[in-house]
Swiss-Prot record:
Reaction catalysed by this enzyme: an aldehyde + a quinone + H2O = a quinol + a carboxylate + H(+)
Organism (species): Amycolatopsis methanolica
Keywords from the named record: FAD, Flavoprotein, Oxidoreductase
Alphabetical list of InterPro entries matching this protein: FAD-bd_PCMH_sub1 (IPR016167)
Protein name per Swiss-Prot or TrEMBL: Aldehyde dehydrogenase beta chain
Length: 26
C-alpha cells in the first residue's frame, strides 16, 4: 500500500485511522 499525498495524521485508535481513510479516500 502506497500512501496518498495528504497531511500525515497521527492516529491513536483504529476508529481514528478509519475516519482518516474515509475522509481522504483510499
Amino acid at each position: 500500500m502506497i500512501p496518498a499525498q495528504f497531511t500525515y495524521r497521527r492516529v491513536s485508535s483504529v476508529d481514528e485511522a478509519l475516519a482518516a481513510v474515509a475522509e481522504h479516500g483510499d
